[in-house]
Amino acid sequence: MCIRDSAWANSLFEDFCEFGLGMTLAVEKMRERLVKLMNRAIEGDSCPAETKELFAAWIADKDNTERSIKLEAQITPIVKANADKCEICKEIASLSQYLIKKSQWIIGGDGASYDIGFGGLDHVLASGKNVNILVLDTEVYSNTGGQASKATPVGAIAKFAAAGKRVRKKDLGLIASTYGYVYCAQVAMGADQAQTLKAIREAEAYDGPSIIIAYAPCINHGLKAGMGKAQAEEAAAVACGYWHLWRYNPELEAEGKNPFTLDSKEPQWEKFQDFLKGEVRFASVMKQYPSEAAELFNAAEDNAKWRYNNYRRLAKQQWGVEQED
């Protein structure tokens, strides 16, 4: 693993996608400048043949992470050693931090992604740029005091939904998948670490926009077992069908395969209601609005079943364009 340069930069919560796209475009421009400089060096007489070969190899493999790491280790010492007598080498040396292909991730919460910043997120996905987005889905505006967002499920209490939310959660992942060229995944690390890592690897390798939505238990959920059991809570959420694991990879459709993979096992629906009762955001409805709690909790379970059945249908359906006879 090669870790270099800034590990983190951030702007306002709601414009995290636009900010991240700007950072990505900035790196892209710097690397384009490197290509121009190396082409000038290749065409000129100031560099020896061996250096020109390295420059040509980097131009060909600059988007291959492993190759760019190896080539950077060879190119950087050469251009730095010749910086005083070669202007092109001096400029390349000043941009050497961009020789290695960077892994860039845009990270935000559900409030910004599903709700107040959704327009920005949609714009970034629609750009077609090779960006990676990770949404930490706490199902509530965690940073601003626990207000309900479009990620908040039916029956959960939050600010602006004091009697329990009455409409179902937005399916951000499926909305993004309708573009057809966006890699999408829904994960829960505590439920399946292998599936989470696989989704991250696939998103990083995919040449285009990607979005991963990760279930993230939050202090606003009021876990009765305590936040120290957040990973176990994720496992329970998937086991009972509250949260589902899946991946949508457009590259598979190009190969004539089904791009949608449902990674969740058949839920144990009999555990669903107990899962809700294990979190204060749901249990509070039973105390404050007992006459409505059963109806809301049943609606929450029905919504989860509806969503799971939809995913199961997508995992079985025929994809692609049907050819006429």
Task: Report the location of each language-model feature.
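Long, compositionally biased charged/polar accessory segments in the mid-to-C-terminal portions
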Residues: 221, 235-280, 286-322
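N-terminal leader/propeptide and maturation segments of large enzyme subunits in energy/redox metabolism
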Residues: 9-84, 88-91
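Structural signal for hydrophobic packing residues in well-ordered secondary-structure cores
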Residues: 31-45, 59, 79, 125-129, ...
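Hydrophobic alpha-helical scaffolding
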Residues: 20-28, 114, 162-166, 186-190, ...
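General structural feature for long, well-ordered alpha-helical segments within catalytic domains
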Residues: 26, 30-37, 51, 67, ...
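Glycine-rich ThDP/TPP pyrophosphate-binding loop and its adjacent helix/strand module
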Residues: 84-86, 92-93, 98-106, 113-132, ...
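Short, small-residue-biased leader/transition segments that mark boundaries at the very start
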Residues: 1-3
